[in-house]
Swiss-Prot record:
Keyword Ribonucleoprotein annotated: yes
Keywords, comma-separated and alphabetical: Ribonucleoprotein, Ribosomal protein
Name of the gene encoding the protein in the UniProt record: rpl10e
Classification via HAMAP family: Ribosomal_uL16_arch (MF_00448)
Entry-linked InterPro entries: Ribosomal_uL16, Ribosomal_uL16_arc, Ribosomal_uL16_CS_euk_arc, Ribosomal_uL16_dom, Ribosomal_uL16_euk_arch, Ribosomal_uL16_sf
TM ranges: none
Species of the source: Methanothermobacter thermautotrophicus (strain ATCC 29096 / DSM 1053 / JCM 10044 / NBRC 100330 / Delta H)
Pfam families assigned: Ribosomal_L16 (PF00252)
Protein name: Large ribosomal subunit protein uL16
Amino acid sequence: MVRAYTRREYIKKIPGSKIVQYDMGNLSAEFPISLSVAVKAPTQITHNALEAARIASNRYMQRRAGRMGYHLKIRVYPHHIVRENPMATGAGADRVQDGMRKAFGKPVSTVALVKKNQKIITIETNKKNFKDAKEALRRAAMKFPVPCRIVIDRGEELVK
């Protein structure tokens, strides 16, 4: 893993995060079952991928369980700022561009640095909506650039 590049006071023009909400669904109720998506390897997950996963899983759960039948939580935040050295292409690019000279790069995105087995998204729900929550997390896991697994955090005895 790389060391986090997060000192915002030294960095100009940091792109904003696309993640709109971190908690969705019924925030006040206590649900007996809790499931999470955990990554199988250390990786970097962009704010775009986190937002795509949030939209996919939240939309599925809203259609299946209704607004009050679940609580979805994003558990990571994209603090790490990613830089890119823009390379020009096309005719005359060699005259315009510096190549690897002054190659520090400009901030282009933010990512969440995730460790192995770290949980990224959690859905709390009841027994009736367990299969829907599992499918919603599977759809969210497809948006990530790393193999994931679905873990039952709480209420394993209720679903067997």
